[in-house]
Amino acid sequence: MVDVNRFKSMQITLASPSKVRSWSYGEVKKPETINYRTLKPEREGLFDEVIFGPTKDWECACGKYKRIRYKGIVCDRCGVEVTRAKVRRERMGHIELKAPVSHIWYFKGIPSRMGLTLDMSPRALEEVIYFAAYVVIDPMDTPLEPKSLLTEREYREKVQEYGYGSFIAKMGAEAIQDLLKRVDLPAEIAELKEELKTATGQKRIKAVRRLDVLDAFNKSGNKPEWMVLNILPVIPPDLRPMVQLDGGRFAASDLNDLYRRVINRNNRLARLLELNAPGIIVQNEKRMLQEAVDALIDNGRRGRPITGPGSRPLKSLSHMLKGKQGRFRQNLLGKRVDFSGRSVIAVGPTLKMYQCGVPREMAIELFKPFVMREIVAKEYAGNVKAAKRMVERGDERIWDILEEVIKEHPVLLNRAPTLHRLGIQAFEPVLIDGKALRLHPLVCEAYNADFDGDQMAIHVPLSEEAQAEARLLMLAAEHILNPKDGKPVVTPSQDMVLGNYYLTMEDAGREGEGMIFKDIDEAVMAYQNGYAHLHSRVGIAVDSMPNKPWKDSQRHKIMVTTVGKILFNAIMPEDLPYLQEPNNANLTEGTPDKYFLEAGQDIQEVIDNLPINVPFKKKNLGNIIAETFKRFRTTETSAFLDRLKDLGYYHSTLAGLTVGIADIPVIDNKAEIIEAAHHRVEDINKAFRRGLMTEDDRYIAVTTTWREAKEALEKRLIETQDPKNPIVMMMDSGARGNISNFSQLAGMRGLMAAPNGRIMELPILSNFREGLSVLEMFFSTHGARKGMTDTALKTADSGYLTRRLVDVAQDVIIREDDCGTDRGLVIRAITDGKEVTETLEERLQGRYTRKSVKHPETGEVLIGADQLISEDMARKIVEAGVEEVTIRSVFTCATRHGVCRHCYGINLATGDAVEVGEAVGTIAAQSIGEPGTQLTMRTFHTGGVASNTDITQGLPRIQEIFEARNPKGEAVITEVKGKVVDIEEDASTRTKKVYVEGKTGNGEYVVPFTARMKVEIGDEVNRGAALTEGSIQPKRLLEVRDTLSVETYLLAEVQKVYRSQGVEIGDKHVEVMVRQMLRKVRVMDPGDTDLLPGTLMDISDFTDANKEIVISGGIPATSRPVLMGITKASLETNSFLSAASFQETTRVLTDAAIRGKKDHLLGLKENVIIGKIIPAGTGMARYRNIEPQAINEVEIIEETEQAEETVVTEAE
C-alpha cells in the first residue's frame, strides 16, 4: 500500500485500456458469484479466488497450502496465491468488451465532453451511440458531410446511390471511437484560436468551451478515444461484498447485479458474433450492452433506472460516491471512531472548570487497554489475556488502577450539532456513580447544552501527542473567549447570576446597618449569627484587605459596603479593585472615594448620604470576567469562574427565590387603558365609514392603537414594579426572562399574527395570570406553532449555510508571518443611515496598522505603521477624533492559499497575535454559520404603505449576500462620479428620472415612482453610489468600481444583518469569506501568455503567468475580476477532491479526469480524505519536521502469535 505521508500531490486522469489491463489480475468471464452449495466462489466469476485472492488468510482455495509459511506460493491445483485475504480489497479484474461502449459521464454530462470534442450535439451523439442513426466517418469521394447523421433508410439509399464501400458510416460507440481517434488536437486548437479573434455572441461562447476541452486533452496527455471503453475494470470483491444472512439467504451489493448484466450481455454478444447473427440482432445486443454499462457507471442518468426487487433503483458506481451517504461524505470525511461512548448529560455543579464526570462502567470500557497494561505491570496477572478476563469479571482491584490511569488523561466531550469549535472540548475525567456524564455548568453555553435529556459523546485521545494537544489546546478551562467576537463565552447564567445578584443587593435600614468590622471574618461571623443582614450597609477596615489596589488616600480608612459585597469581593482576583458599583469606572479605575470615612465622621451620616446601588447583573459579571481575562489570562480566570459559580449557587439556594402566581403583580388601571383603546378604535372605524380614511390607513391606525395600549401597560408595570419581587429580580438580573415575558404575564398579550403573516386587528386583552379565553387561546396557537416549524426549518438552512461556508474557506490557513504587501484597507465606523452598526473602536481592536495614525489636531503620532492596535489604543485613537484608519486587512493580503499574521491580526479566541498554522478559514466559517440559527427567517415589509420594496433580512439576506445573488428590492446605482443636477417625476410612466453630471460624462437613471430616494439635488455622488434605498447588486458594483469597494460593501452588509439581531461577529471572519468569493479572474485578452481567453483562474496563478511574460519582454494578459457565490467558489477550487466531496461529484470528477488535474493537497478536506495529517496547526510542515528525542524506550508486550505476525510484516 501507498504510504500516505510520503506523497505531495494526487492526480486523476482517464484510464487507458492498457492501464486497466495493468491493474487487472485476470478476466471475469462468467456472471456467477458464489456456489450456493459449497459457498465457495465460482471459477472465472465475480468473486473468483484465482483473480482476486484467497477468502481466508494464508490458505489457497483447495486447502492444499495452509499456514503463513507458504506465503507467496501459487497453488498448483487451484491456482490461488497464498496470501492475506485483505488483497480482496485491492485486486481488480476486468471484462473484455466485445463491442466498444461509450462512458456515460463523458457523453451525458453538462456540457457533453464528447460533444464538444467532436463538435456534435448531444442529441446526435445519443442517436449514434444507441443505434438510432449512422454517422458518416469518412465521406471519401462522395459529397456527404463528415459527422452528418443518416437514418437507416437514408443509409441504404446512399449505399445504393454511391455503391458499397464508397464511404464509411457506422453506428454505436464504435463509430464515435473512430471519430475521436481522427481528432487532430493541435490543428483544431489553432483553428479555434483563429476563430476567437473575430467571433462574437453565442458563437464565441461555444468556441471558448470547445477550446477549453480540446486544450485540456492536449495538455493532459489523455487521448479523446479513451472516453469510449473497450475494456471494463471490475472493482475488488470486498468492496461489493456478498454476505450470508441467517436463514441461508444472501445480501449482496447492487454492483454485483449490475456487473452480472454486463457480463451476460457481453457473453451473449460474443456468441452472436461467432454465429454471424443478422446485423439487427447484433445491433440490439450491442445497444443492450451499452445500456448495461451505463447503468453500472451511473444508473438512472439516461432513461429509466434499472431496478432491483421492490422496484428500488440499483446503486451504481456513481451513487457510491455521491451525496451524504456516498463514499466521500460518509466514509472519508467522517468516520466512526473507536474508544468512544455516548450518554445523557447531567449537571455537575461541584466540578472544576477542567473536569467532567465519567460513569465508572463507561470509563473502564473506554480505558480498558490502559488498565490491562497496568494490571500486567503490577503483576496482578501474567499476561494480557488474563488481565482482560480480570477486567471483564469486574475484579475489585481494577477500580484503583482505573483511578490511576485516568489521572492526567484528558477526554474529549462533543455535543451534536457541533456548530463551532467549542462543540468539542477536553476535560479531565472524574469517576462518578450513575450512568450519566456530568458536565460543568459554565461550558453549557459553548455547547448550547441543557439538561432536559441532551446526550453527549465522549472520545479518548490515545497517543501521547494527542493527549498533549487535548490538554494544551482543547482543555475547557482554556476556552474562555468565543472565537467569533472575542467576548467571554463562559458567562454565568440562571442560578449563578441570581445568587450573585441577590448577594450584591443593598437595602436601607436592615439589621446591623452601621456596624464596623475589623476584617472579613468578623463581618461573616456577624452575618452568620444574625447580627447583620447580607444587604445591610456596614463599615470595614481597608487594612484588612492589604493586597487590593487602593489609592494611598484610601488606606487605613473605614469603607462603607455591604456584607454581601464583602463576600462577593473575597472571591475576586486580588489585583482587581474592590467592586462597589456595577460599572466600568469602578472596575478599571478603582473604588470611588465617596465610600470612605474621613477621621471622626459618623458612619450613619455617610450611609444616609450614599445612594442605594443596583446589584450586579449578568452583563456586569461578563465585564468582570473579560477584565480578569485581559489582566490575568486563562488559568486565573478559570479558577475565578469556579469561585463565582460556587458563590452564585450557594447564595441562590440560601435566598430561596421562587415564583408563585401571587408574585405576578396586578396593574391597577389596566381596565381604563383598555377602555380608552376601545373608544379610540371605535372613533377610527367611524371615520373610516364616513370615508375620511382608506382601508390601509384604518388598519394601521387600529393596530397602532393596540400597540400603544400594550406599551402603556408595560410602562405602568415597570413604574410600579417592586425590586424585591422574585420575578422582577430574575428578569432584572438577566437570570431568566425579559420584559416582554413579564408583560405577557402581568399586562396583556397584545396583537397576534394571522397565518398569512398579517397582524390581526383583534388583540389578546388577557394576560397569563388572568388566563385566556377560548378564542384568545386559539389566536395564540398559530404563533406558537409557527415558531416551532420556523426553528426546525431555520436549523437545517443554517446548517447548510455553514457547510457551504466551511467548504469555500477550508484551505485558508495562516501561512506566514508577513506577506509584505503595501496595500491596506481604509476603515471607518459602519453606519446605516443615522445609526452606527459597528463603531470604529470595535473595528480597530486587534488589527495591525498599515500607516501610522496621527492626532488630527496636534499631529502627534499615536501609533506607528505595522503595529498591533490594543483595546486601549483603539479607544485612544477614537477619543482623539480620528475618523478613518488604514489597517492591514485580509482583503489586501498577498499570501498565496492563505493569510499572513499581520493582515489577520489577533486570534479572537486567545486575545494574542494569531499563530502560523491557525485554520482561520474554518473558524471564520463557523463564526458566521453558528449564529445563523439566531437570525430570523422572515422577509420584512417596511412599514405599511410607505414603500413597496420588500427588504430581505435575517438568514435569507445572509444567503443572498454570500451566494452573490441579485438582491430583492435592488437599488439603482450611478456609474459616473459627479453631482445630482435634477430629479424629474414622470406621472404618465410612474417613474422618476435622476440626472447626474460628471467630469467624464453624464448619467441619466430611471427609478420607480415608489422608490425612496437616497440623494437630493445638489448632492455629490461617487461611482457606484446608491441613488435609491435598497440593496446594491454586488456584481453590478464590481463592473462600476473595483474589487475592494465590493469587498467593503459586502462586509458592511453582512455586519448590518447580524448586528440588527444583536449578534456580534469580528470583521476578520467576514473578510476571510468575502475574499474567497473574489479569488478568481476571467482572462479577457491572453496577450503573449498561453492562457485561453475566457478561462477562470486564481488571481495568484494569473499574476504568476504575467510575471513570467513581462520578464521575457512579452505582452501580459488582461483579466476582469469575477464575483462568485460561495457554492460556485467551492466547486471552482483548485482541489478536485475538495470540490467532489462538496457537491456535483460526478461533474467535478469528469472535468478533473479530462484535465489530468493534480491536487496539491493544500486544504484541510483533501488531506482528511486521503488520511494525511491536515496541514494546519501542529500538522504544518514547519512543526512536523522536528526530530523527537527518545528519553527511555517503551517496553512492548507481545504474545507469540503477535510476534509471528510482526516478523512477517517486517519481511513484507
Swiss-Prot record:
GO CC terms of this entry? DNA-directed RNA polymerase complex
Cofactor needs: Mg(2+); Zn(2+)
Catalytic activity, reaction form: RNA(n) + a ribonucleoside 5'-triphosphate = RNA(n+1) + diphosphate
Kind of enzyme, top EC level? transferase
The UniProt entry's GO biological process terms, in alphabetical order, are:
DNA-templated transcription
Q: So where does Zn(2+) 1 get bound?
A: 60, 62, 75, 78
Q: Name one GO molecular function term.
A: magnesium ion binding
Q: Which domain of life is it from?
A: Bacteria
Xref: SMART domains: RPOLA_N (SM00663)
Positions of Mg(2+) binding: 450, 452, 454
Keyword set, alphabetical order: DNA-directed RNA polymerase, Magnesium, Metal-binding, Nucleotidyltransferase, Transcription, Transferase, Zinc
Q: Which InterPro entries match?
A: DNA-dir_RpoC_beta_prime, DNA-dir_RpoC_beta_prime_bact, RNA_pol_asu, RNA_pol_N, RNA_pol_Rpb1_1, RNA_pol_Rpb1_3, RNA_pol_Rpb1_3_sf, RNA_pol_Rpb1_4
Q: What is its EC number?
A: 2.7.7.6
Instruction: Describe cofactor binding as the record notes it.
Output: Binds 1 Mg(2+) ion per subunit. Binds 2 Zn(2+) ions per subunit.
- Record: residues binding Zn(2+) 2: 819, 893, 900, 903
Q: Report quaternary structure and partners.
A: The RNAP catalytic core consists of 2 alpha, 1 beta, 1 beta' and 1 omega subunit. When a sigma factor is associated with the core the holoenzyme is formed, which can initiate transcription.
Q: Which family does it belong to?
A: Belongs to the RNA polymerase beta' chain family.
Q: What does this protein do?
A: DNA-dependent RNA polymerase catalyzes the transcription of DNA into RNA using the four ribonucleoside triphosphates as substrates.
The identity of this protein, by name, is: DNA-directed RNA polymerase subunit beta'
> Which species?
Streptococcus uberis (strain ATCC BAA-854 / 0140J)
Q: Which gene encodes it?
A: rpoC
